[in-house]
Swiss-Prot record:
Gene Ontology, cellular component aspect: cytoplasm; cytoplasmic ribonucleoprotein granule; cytosol; dendrite; membrane; nucleus; P-body
EC number: 3.6.1.62
Residue segments, region Disordered: 132-154, 172-214, 513-536
Pfam families cross-referenced by the UniProt entry: DCP1, mRNA_decap_C
Modification sites for Asymmetric dimethylarginine: 376
Name recorded for this polypeptide: mRNA-decapping enzyme 1A
Tissue: Detected in heart, brain, placenta, lung, skeletal muscle, liver, kidney and pancreas.
Subcellular localization(s) per the UniProt record: Cytoplasm, P-body; Nucleus
Comp. bias regions, Polar residues: 173-196, 522-533
GO biological process: deadenylation-dependent decapping of nuclear-transcribed mRNA; deadenylation-independent decapping of nuclear-transcribed mRNA; mRNA methylguanosine-cap decapping; nuclear-transcribed mRNA catabolic process, nonsense-mediated decay; protein localization to cytoplasmic stress granule
Membrane-spanning intervals of the chain: none
Phosphoserine: residues bearing it: 62, 142, 179-180, 315, 319, 334, 353, 422, 522-523, 525
Length: 582
């Protein structure tokens, strides 16, 4: 039986050595165990899928003891090294233990005797490992021999390799210090960190590192040495950062004792030099000022006390004719762009326009264009809000001619200056529009203008009583050519006083350039009479019969003129009504 059991242990030992070649012998074993684990969340034990034979073995290297459960359910075995941190507690038939990772397990034994025996063996092994660790701590504090190993303990290959690596790094560090003589500032930082590291090393290592420490001091005095990885950290730093660097160097010093320091030499400057431009930027930053964008609106309104809001530039049609001193309109950003350009741009130019002789409280966008452009006559529309625009077909029939004579001032109703026009309304007339029909002579035009002056002023005398006291000025000499499709060109030429041939919402007054006709001006023109708001609404309109009475002399001479004029008149009023409804 003993031979069979001995042969079985040898077979088991050979199987264990396949997993761990440092296993030397089997200390004890038991036939049937099962492993449980404790779940802290559920506060209960959970059975694992590990069960089989328990082996307690000895090893030739640290840790010197361990145990394993060879699982017969699957290929996952339990391997647990035994050290001083392992804690056991016996609860028959369970043996509880907690490892260094604070995981709690429980081993269930089929035989209670095996449970007691394994528990006693584990207690002895943990006590032995505790004594071994205490002895190793005392050996580190006591003087060592030349090879760094004490007489009364076995040789540890891993410890020898670790110490040999430290010796190699120290020698390599000394060689690199001699080969790089121009980096004295970081040497002081590295020496501060190295002294702290040497204090923590065992006394045997201090004896060996003492010559290298003296070597650093000697090379520092003669050549100036430093660690290669510390050199870029000092370039371009101010005094405040230099005071903080010794603490940082002492924290980074243990990382320098790594193998292959020359590989770190190539990689360290890349990470360290990233901080150099930031330090240089920090030193140059007070000399650099933030660029400030100065708009023309801020320069124009620099004398104003209120802070400007968003500046909306005027249209390209307006910009050439605006005076240089006129401030740009300031509107809040919540308004839409189209309403801002048509309604919210209300400003008074600093230089008085030649068309004005009285202060004006406010001007609309269209009236501003009319006053500042001497070669552009606005098309007056009865809609004071400026929302209705003439159509393309109407503009093809009505073309405004440029103003070319001396401009004089004359009182005008405020409602007559409110203009609204499209870009096509401001175009200049062609030279053909100034050519008069050959059938009309100068004498006929004088007679027609005289008769028209007497007829027009009679029905419009009652309108002067409702005149608005606030008046605008109006240019005296205006000319307008009325090309009609399908009819010969008819040019109505009268004086500035008796020039009412059309409704005020359609045309400007037309005058002749003859000085003889200007002398006959005796009464104000109906266009200069300012009608109140109630009369400018679409509800009070001149009927066809009233217009026929006013233009009776033209009806007798040319009946197509009245039809064409009334057609255009109704088109404008219809579109004004549609715009009001919208």
């Amino acid at each position: 039986m003993e031979a069979l059991s001995r042969a079985g242990q040898e077979m088991s030992l050979a199987a264990l050595k396949q997993h761990d070649p440092y296993i030397t012998s089997i200390a004890d074993l038991t036939g049937q165990v099962a492993l449980y684990t404790f779940c802290p969340k559920a506060n209960q034990w959970e059975k694992t899928d590990i069960e089989g034979t328990l082996f307690v073995y000895r090893r030739s290297a640290s840790p010197y003891h361990g145990f394993t459960i060879v699982n017969r359910l699957n290929m996952h075995n339990l391997v647990e090294p035994v050290n001083k941190d392992l804690e056991f507690q016996l609860h028959e038939p369970f043996l509880l233990y907690r490892n260094a990772s604070l995981s709690i397990y429980s081993i269930w034994f089929y035989d209670k005797n095996d449970c007691h025996r394994i528990a006693k063996l584990m207690a002895d092994v943990v006590e032995e490992e505790t004594r071994r660790s205490q002895q190793a701590a005392r050996d580190k504090q006591s003087p060592s021999q030349a090879n760094g190993c004490s007489d009364h303990r076995p040789i540890d290959i891993l410890e020898m390799l670790s110490r040999a690596k430290d010796e190699y790094e120290r020698n390599q560090m000394g060689d690199s210090n001699i080969s790089s003589p121009g980096l004295q500032p970081s040497t002081q930082l590295s020496n501060l960190g190295s002294t702290e590291t040497l204090e923590e090393m065992p006394s045997g290592s201090q004896d060996k590192s003492a010559p290298s420490g003296h070597k650093h001091l000697t090379v520092e005095e003669l050549f100036g040495t430093s660690l290669p990885k510390e050199q870029p950290a000092v370039v371009g730093l101010d005094s405040e950062e230099m005071e903080r660097l010794p603490g940082d160097a002492s924290q980074k010093e243990p990382n320098s004792f790594l193998p292959f320091p020359f590989e770190q030499l190539g990689g360290a400057p890349q990470s360290e030099t990233l901080g150099v431009p930031s330090a240089a930027h920090h030193s140059v930053q007070p000399e650099i000022t933030t660029p400030v964008l100065i708009t023309p609106a801020s320069i124009t309104q620099s004398n104003e006390k209120h802070a400007p809001t968003y500046t909306i530039p005027l249209s390209p049609v307006l910009s050439p004719t605006l005076p240089a001193e006129a401030p740009t309109a300031q509107v809040p950003p919540s308004l839409p762009r189209n309403s801002t350009m048509m309604q919210a741009v209300k400003t008074t130019p600093r230089q008085r326009s030649p068309l004005l002789n009285q202060p004006v409280p406010e001007l609309s966008h269209a009236s501003l264009i009319a006053n500042q452009s001497p070669f552009r006559a606005p098309l007056n529309v009865t809609n004071t809000a400026g929302t209705s625009l003439p159509s393309v077909d109407l503009l093809q029939k009505l073309r405004l001619t440029p103003q070319h004579d001396q401009i004089q001032t004359q009182p005008l109703g405020k409602g007559a200056m409110v203009a609204s026009f499209s870009p096509a309304a401001g175009q200049l007339a062609t030279p053909e529009s100034f050519i008069e029909p050959p059938s009309k002579t100068a004498a006929a035009r004088v007679a027609a203008s005289a008769s028209l002056s007497n007829m027009v002023l009679a029905p419009l005398q009652s309108m002067q009583q409702n005149q608005d006291p606030e008046v605008f000025v109006q240019p005296k000499v205006l000319s307008s050519a009325i090309p009609v499709a399908g009819a010969p060109l008819v040019t109505a030429t009268t004086t500035a006083v008796s020039s009412v041939l059309l409704a005020p919402s359609v045309f400007q007054q037309t005058v002749t350039r003859s000085s003889d006709l200007e002398r006959k001006a005796s009464s104000p023109s109906p266009l200069t009479i300012g009608t109140p708001e109630s009369q400018r609404k679409p509800s009070i309109i001149l009927s066809k019969s009233q217009l026929q009475d006013t233009l009776i002399h033209l009806i007798k001479n040319d009946s197509s003129f009245l039809s064409t004029l009334h057609e255009v008149y109704l088109q404008v009023l219809t579109k004004n009504k549609d715009n009001h409804n919208l």
